[in-house]
Amino acid sequence: MRYITHIIAVIFIMLAHSASAQSGGVVGVAYYDVDALYDTIPSRFYNDKNYTPKGKYKWDSQRYRQKVEHIAQVIDSLHMPIVALYGVENEAVVRDITAIVGEDYAYIHRTQDFSLGLDFALLYYGDVFFPEEVTSHHNALCIDGYIGDCPVTIIINNNSSSLGVLLNRNEYKVEDRAIIVLGKQRAESTSRWQLSDVMSEAEATGRGTVVYYDRWQMRHRIATNIRNIEQCNVYIKEWLLDMEGRPKPTFRGSKYYGGYSTSLPIYIYFDKLLDFSTKKL
């Protein structure tokens, strides 16, 4: 089974187009679940004691720094003007990431009301995306802004019910604008809002973002009403995988592997002159 998994991963690499090449008329957006990137300082508001120097994972400054460098490496490799992250503990972690990436990213971060203490962040080029309003909700973050002259709503989501609440709350905004939903969601929960699950084609060919019982699963998805999509896929590089062809994690169980994440990033390219549905959602 390990051999089969590795072969699938090799095929995966061959099929996935590089997400690093980007022309002037195309915009790329990526999503990455960084898998519990905590700092080393104990929190007073939630239980993160496992991710402290004396905790279960012996999460010291060296391990923390290596993880930050790994995430920055992935972001640099993606070379995307907009990158959504889930799984960062706080704004200080986001600052540490943006301080060492090769590109000059601005960022948006909001503290989430979540028992694990893990937040969302949006990294973006300030000359590509122009945010105007940020709405935070339990397990979701909504950023309204512009790409060029086109109004765009980006929702980073970790729960399908949160997505529905946000879209209902902001119903007056979602007419005549491009909508991009990134993260964990069910296809049926986005289709009711006339958003297309653009990861379904990759999923049908056996690709996914995580390996579960030796099978790829598309645990993270992208849904949108944008029509002129150039490319949408799972981002994979050989160095993101372990010897068995699975995403190389920081931990597997309590054993330290010093990897990147249990998940692979996903991405979408679309024409900068956005073509999107004008139907009321």
What are these regions (language model features)?
Residues 19-100, 104, 273-281:
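N-terminal, active-site-proximal structural segment of metallo-dependent hydrolase catalytic domains
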Residues 21-22, 171-178, 186-281:
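Metal-dependent phosphoester-hydrolase catalytic domains
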Residues 88-157:
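Structured beta-strand-rich core segments of catalytic domains in phosphoester-bond hydrolases
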